[in-house]
C-alpha cells in the first residue's frame, strides 16, 4: 500500500463544470461584466468578453507549455492590461471572489468518493489534493461543503505553488509535504496528460480515474478510444468503490 495518495479535484473528487469553464476560459470576460455592472468600466469594455476570452485562452496555453502558473486574479489583470483597461487590482480581486463563490452551490461529489477516502484513511494512507485551481479558496470551500476537507492533510493548488500540473514538480512537492518519497505515493486523476503522465514523470504511480463524462464524450475532436490510447497509467478505475483495492495492489 502506498503511504500517500493524492487526488485531482475536478472530475475526480467532485464535478463543477461551470467553475472549470470560468477558470480556463471565461473568467476575464465575466469580471468585465461584473465591473460594468458597478460602473467601474465603460459599456464597450464590459461588452468585450470575446476578446477577453481569446486573450485568456492564449495565456492559459502559455501556462500549460511553461508549467509556470498564474493565479486567477493575476491572469485576469494581465488580460485587462493587454486590452488597455485600467482597473485597481483590489476591484479585480473582489470580482473574482464573487464569481468563484457564486459557483459553490453547483459543486457535487463524485459518487463513492467519501467511502473511498474513508477506506484509504483507515488503511493508513495519508491523503492530499493536487488541483490546477487558479483560485485556491474555491477548492478549500468546496471540500468543506462536501464534508471532505478533513480527509486531506494537504490541499495543493497550482496558483498556491506557482506550478501548473504540466510540471511534474508539483507532484514531487505534494509527496514531500505529506512525508513521502515520490515512489511511495500515487496520484488519482482524470486527465491523461496532466494527471497521469505528469505524475508518472515525477516518479509517482498514476491511477487514471475515468468518469462517465469522459467515456461518453468526444474529447478535443478525438474519439474517446483515441484519447484513451495516449495514456499510460499504472492502473485504471471507473468507479470509486474500486479505488482502495487498486491502491493496495500498487505495492
Label each residue range with its predicted role:
Residues 1-5, 15-16, 33, 42-43, ...:
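Asp-based, Mg2+/Mn2+-dependent phosphohydrolase catalytic module
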Residues 1-50:
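Active-site neighborhood of HAD-like aspartate-dependent phosphohydrolases
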Residues 43-98:
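A metal-dependent, Asp-based hydrolase signature
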Amino acid at each position: 500500500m502506498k503511504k500517500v495518495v493524492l487526488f485531482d479535484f475536478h472530475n475526480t473528487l467532485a464535478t463543477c463544470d461551470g467553475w472549470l469553464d470560468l477558470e480556463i476560459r471565461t473568467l476575464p470576460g465575466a469580471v468585465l461584466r461584473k465591473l460594468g455592472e458597478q460602473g467601474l468600466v465603460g459599456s464597450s469594455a464590459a461588452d468585450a468578453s470575446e476578446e477577453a476570452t481569446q486573450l485568456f485562452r492564449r495565456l492559459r496555453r502559455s501556462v500549460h507549455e511553461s508549467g509556470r502558473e498564474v493565479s486567477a486574479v493575476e491572469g485576469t489583470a494581465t488580460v485587462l492590461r493587454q486590452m488597455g483597461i485600467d482597473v485597481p487590482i483590489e476591484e479585480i480581486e473582489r470580482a473574482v471572489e464573487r464569481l468563484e463563490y457564486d459557483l459553490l452551490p453547483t459543486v457535487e461529489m463524485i459518487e463513492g468518493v467519501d467511502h473511498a477516502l474513508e477506506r484509504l484513511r483507515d488503511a493508513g494512507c495519508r491523503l492530499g489534493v493536487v488541483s490546477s485551481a487558479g483560485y485556491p479558496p474555491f477548492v478549500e470551500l468546496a471540500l468543506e461543503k462536501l464534508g471532505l476537507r478533513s480527509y486531506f492533510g494537504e490541499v495543493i493548488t497550482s496558483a498556491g505553488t506557482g506550478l501548473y500540473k504540466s510540471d511534474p514538480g508539483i507532484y514531487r512537492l505534494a509527496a514531500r509535504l505529506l512525508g513521502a518519497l515520490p515512489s511511495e505515493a500515487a496520484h488519482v486523476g482524470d486527465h491523461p496528460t496532466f494527471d497521469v503522465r505528469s505524475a508518472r514523470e515525477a516518479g509517482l504511480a498514476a491511477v487514471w480515474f475515468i468518469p462517465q463524462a469522459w467515456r461518453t464524450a468526444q474529447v478535443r475532436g478525438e474519439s474517446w478510444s483515441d484519447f484513451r490510447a495516449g495514456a499510460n497509467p499504472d492502473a485504471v478505475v471507473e468507479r470509486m468503490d474500486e479505488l482502495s483495492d487498486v491502491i493496495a495492489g500498487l505495492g
